[in-house]
Amino acid sequence: VSANHEDQVALNIAVNLLNNANGTGYLDKLMVEHKLMGALAINESMNEAGILAVAIMPKLLIQSYSSAEKMVWDEINRVKNGDFSDEMFNSLKLEQKRQYASSLENIDSRATIMMNLFSQGKSWNDYLNEVARIESITKEDVVRVAQKYFSNNYLCVTKSTGKYPKDNLPKPAFSPVVPRNADASSSYAKQLEKIPEQQVAPRIIDFEKDVKTSKLTPLVTLYTTPNPLNDIFTFNISYGIGALEQPELMQLTNYLQLLGTESLPFEQFRS
C-alpha cells in the first residue's frame, strides 16, 4: 500500500510479526532454528503505490522450493488467523514508536523525513500524529489487513543458481550530454544563498563532566550518559581485543544474538 494509505501502519505491524529488528518474528524463527537459509517479508510504501513481498531461500541441495514455500505460508497463516500473543503485539507497537522517536535524534534522518513528507503531501504534524495511530491499532486491524493483502493473488518468481550466458554490448558512439542550464540557479536556490551562515563552534565532549564512569570489575568499565532528546537508551559492548588476536570473537558476536538469559528464553529476552 502507499504511504498515505489507511492500512499502512497496520500492515507494517503484520509484516513485523514475520520479520523484525529483534529477530523474534515467525520467519526469523525459521532461520534461527535452521529450517530455512533465509526468509524475509518486505513492505515498501511509496508515494503512490506499495510493494509487499516475501523472499525465501531454501537450504541448498537438500530442500525443495515447494517445502520452503509451505513453511513460510504456514507462518503467514498464523498472522492471518490471529495466532500471536498480546505481549508480542504490544512489543511490536512499542518498537514502531521507538523507531519513530529515534529517527528524530539526528539531523540527517530528520531531513530525510521532511523530504519524504513533502513528496507525500504531508505536514510535520502528520508525522507526529502517526505515533498516535500506532497506539490506536488493534489486533483485529492487523488480522484484517493480513487477510486482505497476504492473499492467493500473488506473483511467484523462482531463481535457480548457476551461470547464464551474457551478451557483451559494444560501447555506443554517443557524444556526452551537455546540460543547457548548468550555470543557472532557480529562485529557490537564490533564496537559500541569501540566508546568512552562522558560525557554530564545536562542542567537545568532556569525559569528566559529560560521561559517568563506573568501574564494575578490574576489566570492565561502564560509561553512561543521559539521552537529552528522548527516553530511549542504547547499550553497546566494546571489547578491548581484536579479531586477529582472538578470532573466536567474530563467531561469538553472532552467537550472542541467539541467546536469552537464565530466566528468559530467546523470544522473551529479545522482545
Specify the residue positions occupied by each region the protein language model found:
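Buried hydrophobic packing residues in well-ordered domains
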Residues: 12-14, 30, 54, 72, ...
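M16/MPP (pitrilysin/insulinase) zinc-metallopeptidase core fold and M16-derived inactive scaffolds
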Residues: 20-35, 48, 236-271
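Short beta-strand/turn micro-motifs at beta-sheet edges
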Residues: 38-44, 222-225
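Scaffold signal of the M16-like zinc-metallopeptidase fold and its non-catalytic homologs
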Residues: 4-5, 21, 42-49, 75, ...
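Acidic/histidine-enriched alpha-helical segments
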Residues: 31-32, 74-113, 130-133, 154-165, ...
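Extracytoplasmic
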Residues: 8, 24-25, 36, 47-51, ...
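M16/insulysin-pitrilysin zinc metalloprotease superfamily fold
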Residues: 2, 21-22, 45-103, 246, ...
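Proteolytic maturation boundary segments
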Residues: 28, 126-238
